[in-house]
Amino acid sequence: MFIILAAGHGKRMNSGLPKVLHKIGNFSMLQHIIYNARQLNPENISVVANLPLIERLKCLEDIQLITQESTLGTGDAVKTAVRNMKELSDSNIIVVQYGDTPLIKNSTITQMVSCLEGKALVCLGFKTSNKEYGRLIIENGSLREIVETQDDENSDEEFLANAGIMVAYAKNLRELVEKIECNGSTYEYYLTDIVSIAVKSNLNVGYVTTDEEEATGINSRNDLAKAEFYFQENRRKFFTDSGVTLVAPETVFFSLDTQIGMDSIIYPYVFFGPGVRIGPGAKIGPFTKCEDTTIGDGAIVGNFVEAKASDIGTNTKIKHLSYIGNTEVGRESNIGAGTVVCNYDGKKKHRTNIGSNCFVGANSSLIAPLNVHDESVIAAGSIIVKDVPKKRLVITRRKQMVKKIK
C-alpha cells in the first residue's frame, strides 16, 4: 500500500499551481509516483492532500483521496491516512512517500521492503552536503533518529540525509504516528519523529541508501530543472540499453510513458510528448515532435515533422516538413514534403484517414474530415476537401499557364 503526501503548499516554487502538479517529463510529480506505484500492484494507493488539490485530483482512477483538513505537518497527514485507508490490516506493508520525490525507483522501494523483516520501519538515506535535508543519525548500523539540519550543531560537510520515504508494517506505523507530539515552535507533527519514538520503544529501525539524484526533493524551480535533467538522463540510458540508437542523446527529450522498439534510430533534437509508442526499426528524423501518437515498425518520420494524436502504419514515410494531426495512416504510404493535415475548423478537431500504399504529393493540404482510401495518389500541391476513392489519382491545382513577358 502507498501513502503519498501531497498537502504541502510549495511556497518556494512561486506558483499558483500546487507543487506536486509541476511536471517532469511532461507528467506531474504526483503522476510519476502513482505511475511507479502501480507497477508494484499495491492493494491501495492513497493521496493525502488539502481540499483545493483534492478537487483537482478527482479525475484520478483507482486512487483513494484523503483530505488533510488543516496543514499540521507530515505526521498528521500520515495519521489521517492510516485512520481512513480502506481495507487496511496490521500485516499490510505501507510505503510512505513525499509527493515531491518523483525519481525514487521501484527497485529501491523493493530493496526497502526486503530490509523490513525484523524491523518496525525502514527509511531511505543518501549522501549529500546540502543542509536543506534532514540528517539520519546512525549508531551501530541502526537508524536512531532523524534531525533537522539546523538543529544539528555537529553536522559534517557531507552527511547521510533523509530522502523522505519510509516503509513500515501498518500495525507499527499506526501505533507510532499516534505517539507523535506537536512541535512547540511550528505547531506541526513531524513524521520523522517516529524513528526516535520507535527506538525508545525498543523497536529496530533500518535504512537503505541511494544516490542524491534519485532522492532529489523538489522545493524550487531550480530543483525542478535538476530533476528534469536527471529524469532525461535516466531515460536516455534506459533506451540505449534497450537497443535504441540515440545519435545525440543529450538532444532527445522523453516523456514518462514513451515507448520505443528495438533497433529504432532517433536523430538529434527530437521531442516526445505524452502517449508516444514507436515500433521496432523506426527512424525519427531531426527536429521532430510527436505526441499521443503510435508509429509502426520500420516507419520513417521527420525531419521537421509534427505528429499529434495520430497512428502511423508500418513502413510508412513522412519525411519532411509536415504536420500530421488526428490522422490514421495505413501501411507503406508516403506523405510528401510540406503536407499539412488541416484538422481544426476553429471550433473542434476532425479525423483524417489515409489508407495503405497511398502517395500524397508534396505541399498538399488535406482538409478534415477526410478519407483517402488505399492505393490512392494525390498530386503535389493539391488541396483535398472530399474523400478520395480507392486507387484513384486526384489533382486539384490549376493548369499551369505560360505567358511571354513584355
From Swiss-Prot:
GO terms for molecular function: glucosamine-1-phosphate N-acetyltransferase activity; magnesium ion binding; UDP-N-acetylglucosamine diphosphorylase activity. The gene is glmU. Binds 1 Mg(2+) ion per subunit. Residues 222-242 are annotated as: Linker. Its main location: cytoplasm. Residues 243-406 are annotated as: N-acetyltransferase. CDD domains: GT2_GlmU_N_bac. It comes from the Bacteria. It is found in: Cytoplasm. The active site is at residue 320. One of its GO terms (cellular component) is membrane. Acetyl-CoA binds at residues 337, 343-344, 380, 397. It comes from Wolbachia sp. subsp. Brugia malayi (strain TRS). It catalyses: alpha-D-glucosamine 1-phosphate + acetyl-CoA = N-acetyl-alpha-D-glucosamine 1-phosphate + CoA + H(+); N-acetyl-alpha-D-glucosamine 1-phosphate + UTP + H(+) = UDP-N-acetyl-alpha-D-glucosamine + diphosphate. It holds the Pfam family Hexapep. The lineage of its organism: Bacteria, Pseudomonadati, Pseudomonadota, Alphaproteobacteria, Rickettsiales. SUPFAM superfamilies: Nucleotide-diphospho-sugar transferases (SSF53448), Trimeric LpxA-like enzymes (SSF51161). Residues 1-221 are annotated as: Pyrophosphorylase. Homotrimer. In the N-terminal section; belongs to the N-acetylglucosamine-1-phosphate uridyltransferase family. Mg(2+) binds at residues 100, 219. Its cofactor is Mg(2+). GO terms for biological process: cell morphogenesis; cell wall organization; lipid A biosynthetic process; peptidoglycan biosynthetic process; regulation of cell shape; UDP-N-acetylglucosamine biosynthetic process. This is Bifunctional protein GlmU.
